[in-house]
Amino acid sequence: MIELGARMGGDCITTHLVPLSTGIDMVKATIQIALGECPSIAPRFDKGAAIRYIEETNGVIENISGIDKVNSINGIEHVVLTKAVGDVVNRISSSVDRIGYVISQADTAQAAIDLCENAMKHIVITTK
């Protein structure tokens, strides 16, 4: 064994995508396990969830548009920006370098992917 990380998955997998696609609260289940309790991990439903990360070229953010439009799309559950106008954007070398992300939920995985892909078309980030 090289490494063992007894933790929840990152990049919104256990905090957002699993609950949106199955109804399972992974955070609660993890806490229950830590307390020696037996968590309920039976799926409550079967849906699709997807995430797309916002990427941009290097530079300083001059403008961000389209967020209100994306927030109004049915099935878009979360739009998160981690950078703002005036922030420096560098080449992505880790999760903390991301500008933000969009998460969707739909009846199928493909429909959720399509929602995210459509949402990304509306987000415009200008850098200099």
Question: What is each of the regions a protein language model found here?
Answer:
Residues 2:
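Active-site flanking residues adjacent to catalytic metal/cofactor-binding acidic residues
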Residues 5-65:
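Active-site "cap" helix and flanking loop/linker of ATP-utilizing ligase/carboxylase catalytic domains
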Residues 25-40, 77-97, 127-128:
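Short secondary-structure transition/capping segments
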Residues 28, 71, 110-113:
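Generic structural signal for individual residues within well-ordered alpha-helical segments
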Residues 46, 66-72, 117-121:
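Short intrinsically disordered coil segments
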Residues 46-51, 74-76, 96-100:
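Active-site lining segments that contact anionic ligands and/or coordinate catalytic metals
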Residues 54-88:
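Glycine-rich active-site loop/lid that clamps phosphate-bearing ligands
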Residues 84-128:
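Generic C-terminus detector
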